[in-house]
Amino acid sequence: MFSEKANTIFQDVIKTYKVLNTVDQPFTNKYNKSDDLIAHLLYRKSWIDTVQWAYEDIIRDPNIDPVAALKLKRKIDASNQDRTDTVEFIDSYFLDKYKDVAAKANAKINSESPAWVIDRLSILALKIYHMHLETVRADASDAHKAACQTKLNVLLEQREDLSTAIDDLLTDISNGDKYMKVYKQMKMYNDDELNPVLRGQK
């Protein structure tokens, strides 16, 4: 199933990132886009999410230098744009894959495109990884670890449900029971024609 492939890639990305565990490390995609385009895109998507998770931790440091915080905020904005672009590339992959499928007369549209469901699955992998760390943290109290284990159990159940949902959605699209319709996110904050502050600097 697709979800099994995606979840395996997401876990591998996190494991690979944590070897050096720094936002400044170089990125190397383990998958060639000519050989396995969707794996290439999933790996890239998960890497963006993993680095941004670290960015969000760093910027919440109450002692962070304001200049460094501003620089990091710009990196987060760029990362968000990269994330959105990659999600749209993933949807383009599925649009192309299913372009010859004739939607049935009673076919319905899903509230989310496949790629945005995959986006949530990628973020969920990070939540599960970090919540698991809290359940085995040596300096944490038993109460803390127990509370985190309860949360982890919910996250694991959520991953199971979300994995089933994306597999069912792709099956429905491939059978013509549902059809894809993708809207670009139209993010405005990085566009110097749409952000009034940036526009005023031109």
PLM regions and their residue ranges:
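Anionic, Ser/Thr-rich low-complexity intrinsically disordered regions
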Residues: 1-202
